[in-house]
């Protein structure tokens, strides 16, 4: 995830990587993801293909 650009990719357990935009990350404050961080999300059809939405960091 690139904090400066506000987007990155999620690698699901199966299937291709999914694009994720900072607006899709749930929560307050600065929205970012760390490499290797476990998350839950839903896959949705975006303008340029499948992408992650309603992304939440796992506790």
From Swiss-Prot:
| Predominant cellular place of this UniProt entry's protein | cytoplasm
An example molecular function term from Gene Ontology annotations? DNA binding
| Record SUPFAM superfamilies | Nucleic acid-binding proteins (SSF50249)
Give all residue intervals belonging to the CSD domain: 1-55
Compartment(s) where it occurs, according to its Swiss-Prot or TrEMBL record? Cytoplasm
| One term under GO cellular component | cytosol
Q: Name the keywords, alphabetized.
A: Activator, Cytoplasm, DNA-binding, Stress response, Transcription, Transcription regulation
Induction remark: In response to low temperature.
Q: Which InterPro entries match?
A: Cold_shock_CspA, Cold_shock_domain, CSD, CSD_CS, CSP_DNA-bd, NA-bd_OB-fold
Question: What task does this protein carry out?
Answer: Affects cell viability at low temperatures.
Write the protein's name: Temperature acclimation protein A
Organism for this UniProt entry: Pseudomonas fragi
């Amino acid at each position: 995830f690139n904090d400066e650009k506000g987007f990155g990719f999620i690698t699901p357990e199966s299937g291709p990587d999914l694009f994720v935009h900072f607006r899709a990350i749930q929560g307050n404050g600065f929205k970012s993801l760390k490499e290797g961080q476990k998350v839950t999300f839903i896959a949705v059809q975006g303008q340029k293909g499948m992408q992650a939405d309603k992304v939440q960091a796992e506790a």
